[in-house]
């Protein structure tokens, strides 16, 4: 039976804890195309109607730092598409989804409305960005990106996670509820539109397991490094809180999450190797796995230094 006990930091106020050091076996690299930052700053300024105050506030979250480490091999044109779609997602989530200002009816309109007929800023921008992707990417991979954005947005607007997650949720139950929440599959799809992965591979059991551990790993990275930011909120959309309610110790819970992240990295490696052994001649698959690993190591790195997570 689910126990809907809310988190209350006051119950653990006397506990000291430190964020654990996570041993990542994946390489890390930064993108050399740092000049694209000027394009992002200009785009964000236009997005906020040339409001310097609003654009500075958003840019202060250092999202470009996230992109530089998460997508180290993206070309300037690709990086421009990536920052636009990811910034679009961050902003629409902050403006509409988290505040519950928009629901499923808006979401259906967003994905079905012709941008030329819509007066809504987010709808118009979304399809403009997708059209930019079409200039450089593969149709099937862009379709995957659109589907992943929809899955993320649907998860965000439904907010069903608050009802499904309870204080006695297992990690598997927690992941089932939060699978699309942080948008990590969407982020990977945004950076792999230049390559095509055959349907046979995408639907294989090993590929789905690789994706699962990729999501587990990155969701828990988010939970670990967002805990300080979220610790005063009563909701249980952070596994550190759930584990603490179960065991009584914040430090023990953080250590458990760190250990699970490291185990997830091992699972990612194992399933990656199995896929490459099964499809040894598929160069695109190797590139996809490379992107997945660098996105993970980049996410881990920026989570400890980026203002968006503080």
UniProtKB/Swiss-Prot annotation:
Motif (NDxxSxxxD/E motif): 222-230
KW Ligase (keyword) present: no
Keywords in alphabetical order: Lyase, Metal-binding
Enzyme class: lyase
Catalytic reactions on record: (2E,6E)-farnesyl diphosphate = (E)-beta-farnesene + diphosphate; (2E,6E)-farnesyl diphosphate = (1S,2S,4R)-beta-elemene + diphosphate; (2E,6E)-farnesyl diphosphate = (3E,6E)-alpha-farnesene + diphosphate
Domain of life, per lineage: Eukaryota
Enzyme Commission identifier(s): 4.2.3.-, 4.2.3.46, 4.2.3.47
UniProt GO molecular function: metal ion binding; terpene synthase activity
Span of the annotated motif DDxx(x)D/E motif: 93-98
Domains: entry comment: Contains several highly conserved motifs that are important for catalytic activity including the aspartate-rich 'DDxx(x)D/E' motif and the 'NDxxSxxxD/E' motif, both of which are involved in complexing metal ions to coordinate the binding of the isoprenyl diphosphate substrate in the active site.
Function per UniProt: Terpene synthase that converts its substrate farnesyl diphosphate (FPP) into the sesquiterpenes beta-elemene, (E)-beta-farnesene and (E,E)-alpha-farnesene.
Family membership noted in the UniProt record: Belongs to the terpene synthase family.
The protein's name: Terpene synthase 6
Organism: Dictyostelium purpureum
